[in-house]
Amino acid sequence: MKWKEQAIILGTRQYGETSVILEVMTRQHGRYMGVVKGGRSRRMAVLLQPGNFVEAEWWARLDEHLGLFRLEALDLHAARLILFPEALYALQLIVFHLHLLPERDPHPILYDILHLFMQSFDEPFINAELLVRFEMRFLEELGFGLDLSRCAATGRLEKLCYVSPKSGRAVCEEAGHPWREKLLNLPQFLVQRTVRPVDFSDIKNGFILTGFFLMRHVWEPRNIKQPSVRISLIQLFEQRFRMQASFVDLKTINRM
């Protein structure tokens, strides 16, 4: 058995005295593992850092075998990732989520979002939005997707402002207003792809929304808690948004 595909490195663990077991995410083959001979050498250590983009060739005698990897560097993101704490935390969170999916099960859209994330990891505002979208898609891949297409109560397509915590379906402003304290807020960037998050409240509402359904459908059934890295990441995003807002205010004052 053999395949060759571009991949994003997720992590490694020691295998014998000189080798490692490498874990990557690919578009067509999903999360995959294999042995890299000599992977503990200094030269290979640079290549095998999480976040690096490689051309991966995997082969084994039988499909069920662990197999071997041969790698070629395409884009070594890891050296720059350390400059952006939000990106490091976000990658750790994405890897945490991916570990909840079956190995060798393709999830091309999740791969595409991860790839886009790695292309823009130095843009924290873009990454915050991408991570919310990743968690939304992750829920869908597990069969717990939210229905944000129309109001669950009226069928309306406009002014969708809430999500029912019971059904996971959108609710319009008119129908949801009397029950707004019991509903989850729906940020507009999840409804309209042309809309970008206005401020941190949009991002925070996005994480609250995905976190609620992740807890119900994914974490609690597996007896696991919300990952601490997710909590830290949301706090980092909030700090970054506040710094940006202060910078914008200062520029406005200087023009007066």
Curated annotation (Swiss-Prot):
InterPro entries: ARFGAP/RecO, DNA_rep/recomb_RecO_N, NA-bd_OB-fold, RecO, RecO_C. GO terms for cellular component: bacterial nucleoid. Keywords: DNA damage, DNA recombination, DNA repair. One of its GO terms (biological process) is DNA recombination. Belongs to the RecO family. Involved in DNA repair and RecF pathway recombination. This is DNA repair protein RecO. It comes from Bartonella henselae (strain ATCC 49882 / DSM 28221 / CCUG 30454 / Houston 1) (Rochalimaea henselae).
